[in-house]
Regions:
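Conserved catalytic or regulatory cores that recognize and/or transform ribose-phosphate-containing ligands
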Residues: 1-212
Length: 212
């Protein structure tokens, strides 16, 4: 039994207003503390590329067209969401100190573009996060590699899926290897390359500021 029932009122908001609403809800949970963020593949990543290889197509749109939207949801999106949530749960159990671990997987904002989602998570990383853990094979994901660049730019500690320090040099190595392997199969790696360039620029800037 509920004392109040949700209404069917219609609201029209700007993007930044929706962001403020979402962050106000997150702040109710964090209450001035900072979280650990679990970065994991969702819309892109190794699972997607393996499916592209299997079905002999080059893009996500081609895969959806060939196999159908329902197939894509069942075989790519839903497994990625489950893996991301499982990863965040494993991080929380590993830490075992009550720290809130945030996963982006359950969050939906109808009408948002991919850049708007990325801007939202970038703000969360820069303002409400104290470290970022990356799931296995994160280097194949456009979103994860972007979040790695943000973490490095913000000076956040980064860890791999087992809790070992990741760091900029290892991240650059992993991202470069992923791009090379995907390039060899003819996939479009422009977004991965852009994120790698971001990290490399941060590395050069840091070395210039703190020469050995």
């Amino acid at each position: 039994m509920s004392f109040y029932s949700p209404s069917d009122s219609k609201f029209t908001r700007l993007y930044h207003e929706e962001v403020e609403i979402a962050f106000s809800a997150i702040d109710c949970v964090l209450n001035r503390e900072k979280s650990v963020y679990g970065s994991a593949e969702l819309t892109t990543g190794l699972r997607l590329y393996e499916a592209l290889r299997e079905h002999k197509v080059k893009t996500r749109d081609e895969l959806k067209q060939k196999m159908g939207a329902a197939w894509f949801t069942s075989n790519i999106w839903n497994p990625n969401v489950k893996s991301a949530r499982d990863f965040a749960e494993s991080v929380r159990h590993t830490l075992d100190d009550g720290t809130t671990v945030i996963t982006p997987a359950p969050f939906t904002a109808p009408g948002w573009s991919q850049p708007e989602y990325l801007a939202f998570w970038e703000t969360l990383l820069r303002t409400r996060t104290k470290s970022v853990w990356f799931s296995l094979n994160w280097q194949y994901s456009n979103g994860c590699t972007f979040e790695f660049a943000v973490a490095e730019d913000a000076g956040l500690p980064t860890f791999d899926h087992e809790g070992r320090p990741l760091g900029r040099s290892k991240g650059i190595e992993l991202m470069g290897g992923a791009i090379q392997s995907l390039d060899e199969d003819g996939f479009n790696t422009s977004t991965l390359a852009e994120n790698l360039k971001r990290v490399q620029t941060i590395d050069v800037r840091t070395r210039e500021a703190f020469p050995v």
